[in-house]
A protein has these predicted regions:
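Conserved phosphate- and dinucleotide-binding cores of soluble alpha/beta proteins
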Residues: 1-138
Length: 138
């Protein structure tokens, strides 16, 4: 979670000792991490069926340096279920409001100037499944 392009938080190809080093890494071929393979198996090009064997095990991707030098950027967080809920809500909020870090690569977009549009499915408040936590506390 928190990847952009195929810059995954636990990818061996994008390991760096510091944020400064991370931001200098360019494009490369990556080996997909298991969570990304599972997520991508849910999309149309892979049959939207959860068939992880239909997902290519490697990807050609831009690097953090390319993200930072891009003139314009589009990062979409609009995948919603039929009821309007979204499995992307937590990671989207980490990217928008959490620390800028290598552990959430897409958070580096916040280092750039630009506009961010967030779908209603992502923006709506979290509800709590636990009685002791009020929605206002989340």
């Amino acid at each position: 979670p928190g990847h952009t392009a195929f810059i995954d938080p636990c990818s061996e190809e994008f390991k760096a000792a510091s944020m400064e080093e991370f931001l200098q890494l360019g494009s490369r071929i990556t080996t997909e991490v298991p969570l990304t393979v599972c997520e991508n198996s849910l999309f149309g090009p892979m049959g939207a069926s959860g068939d992880v064997w239909a997902v290519p095990p490697k990807s050609a991707t831009i690097g953090p340096r390319d993200v930072m030098h891009a003139k314009e950027v589009v990062e979409l967080h609009n995948f919603a279920n039929a009821d309007g809920s979204s499995w992307q809500r937590m990671v989207s909020r980490l990217e928008l409001y959490g620390p800028i870090s290598m552990e959430c690569p897409a958070s580096i977009y916040r280092l750039k100037k630009g506009v961010c549009y967030v779908s209603e499915a992502i923006a709506k408040p979290f509800g709590s499944w636990y009685n002791g936590i009020a929605d206002k506390d989340i």
